[in-house]
Swiss-Prot record:
Record keyword Hydrolase present: yes
Secretion signal span: 1-25
GO MF term (any one): IAA-Ala conjugate hydrolase activity
Transmembrane segments: none
Protein's UniProt name: IAA-amino acid hydrolase ILR1-like 7
Protein EC: 3.5.1.-
Gene3D superfamilies: 3.30.70.360, Zn peptidases (3.40.630.10)
Keywords: Hydrolase, Signal
Family recorded in the similarity comment: Belongs to the peptidase M20 family.
Originating species: Oryza sativa subsp. japonica
Enzyme class: hydrolase
Length: 455
């Protein structure tokens, strides 16, 4: 018996084989880990699940805190690069929560950092972003927290964005020990036309970021619902100002003048032919002339007329084509009508925004997390929207996902007003939803990518 057992190598090899199998199972290949991460359901890692985060954000004390923040910001709207008071509020709340931050970033911005575990900040870095600036509008909503700043209003929901990100900061800080990486929270200035995102990127505070997520309120969809889509989601956009100069004269003798108003009218009509006859019907493009300024007397043909507006496309190539043709058409009409023309695209003052393109993988990740937070019925596939967003600059740099989050309520709102309306209102039930979704998207991303960042 002793001789037969010592002559066979199988009993000795069996423990070694089992040990190798255990080691391989605990350290899969990077490709296998990545595939598992893409397939994993949301809420599978450490920390709170999406549903738990939403319950925490909806707790009476937490929700009341969010409402108070949003109302304070709403009463004191500030325009692009003027967000001094808003920035002070953000920093005060971060101090109270115990979250460190960098300031100033891009003049008035704040970038907070929540490092998981021991706070060393090793591993994957994920970013969340909210914009802070308001619009030059006089608020016409009659409620106790309306704007106290004449001619300024949060008519695009950036007060809600800032509040939701502060809520996410509080949730993430409470789950700090379970974070498998670092979350950066970007409180960004100057989204409304001044490309604040570009200035944030130029300062290098996001150079270590692996991916980014953002939300924007949408009154067209019901509160508690989000929409998005992979690929192009929001349009690229540019602005133009055309000036046509002729020869002024008496209205009774137009033959002695060179009429710039007629020239401008002809050019404006022809601009729409770019969309109607030069653009593929399956590709979205918009040219909108939004103002025209000429003389101020009934009986005088003015010497010059100016007009301008925006142009938009879902591709960079489409935007470049629109820009080229606007210039050609305005100048050609001026020549035909014996006028001169200049077209200014104001790119130094107002940088054109690229299209916001959702990364396929990041979209799938954010959608899965949103389903975990809101349920399948709360997550819809959206259609492309011809509005533009400087979040696009982040999306050019990192894998990004941008979602619209509903603030409409058919039950409580007599009428739904669009973004940028002086009558725009927000259903504040969105605040805990956005806070929880921000936090869940970040936490689950770090859970999924912890292996590739630390192995």
């Amino acid at each position: 018996m002793a001789a037969s057992s010592s002559s066979s190598p199988l009993p000795l090899a069996l423990p070694l084989l089992l040990l190798l199998l255990v080691l391989f199972a605990s350290h899969p290949s990077p490709h296998a880990a990545a595939a598992a991460a893409d397939a994993a359901p949301a809420g599978g890692g450490g920390g709170g699940s999406g549903g738990e985060l939403l319950s925490a954000a909806r707790a009476p004390g937490f929700a009341a805190w969010l409402r108070g923040l949003r109302r304070s910001i709403h009463r004191h709207p500030e325009l692009a690069f003027e967000e001094v008071r808003t920035s002070e509020l953000v920093r005060a709340e971060l101090d109270a929560i115990g979250v460190p931050y960098e300031w100033p970033v891009a003049r008035t911005g704040v970038v907070a950092t929540i490092a998981g575990g021991d706070g060393a900040g090793a591993g994957t870095v994920f970013a969340l972003r909210a914009d802070m600036d308001a619009l030059p509008l006089q608020e016409l909503v009659d409620w106790e927290h309306k704007s106290e700043e004449s001619g300024k209003m949060h008519a695009c929901g950036h007060d809600a964005h800032t509040t939701m990100l502060l809520g996410a900061a509080k949730l993430l800080q409470s789950q700090k020990d379970d974070l498998k990486g670092t979350v950066k929270l970007v409180f960004q200035p100057a989204e409304e036309g001044y490309a604040g995102a570009r200035y944030v990127l130029q300062e290098g505070v996001l150079d270590d970021v692996s991916a980014i997520f953002g939300l924007h309120v949408d009154p067209r969809i019901q509160v508690g619902t989000v929409t998005s889509r992979p690929g192009p989601f929001l349009a690229a956009s540019g602005r133009f100002l055309a000036t046509i100069t002729g020869k002024g004269g008496h209205a009774a003798g137009p033959h002695n003048a060179v009429d710039p108003i007629l020239t401008a009218s002809s050019a404006i009509v022809s601009l729409q032919q770019i969309v109607a006859r030069e653009t593929d019907p399956l590709e979205a493009a918009v040219i909108s002339v939004t103002f025209m300024k000429g003389g101020d007397a009934y009986n005088v043909i003015p010497e010059s007329v100016s007009f301008g507006g925006t142009f938009r496309s879902l591709t960079s190539e489409g935007l470049s084509y629109l820009k080229k043709r606007i210039k050609e058409i305005v100048e050609a009409h001026a020549t035909v009508h014996r006028c001169t023309a200049t077209v200014d695209f104001m790119e130094e003052e107002r940088i054109p925004y690229p299209a916001t393109v959702n990364d396929e993988g990041m979209y799938r990740h954010a959608r899965a997390v949103a389903v975990d937070v809101l349920g399948e019925d709360g997550v819809k596939v959206g259609t492309p929207f011809m509005g533009s967003e400087d979040f696009a600059f982040y999306a050019q740099r990192f894998p990004a996902a941008f979602f619209m989050i509903g603030v409409g309520n058919e039950t409580t709102m007599r009428k739904v007003y669009p973004l940028h309306s002086p009558h725009f209102v927000v259903d504040e039930d969105v605040l805990p939803v956005g806070a929880a979704l921000h936090a869940a998207v970040a936490m689950e991303y770090l859970n999924k990518h912890a292996f590739t960042a630390t192995f």
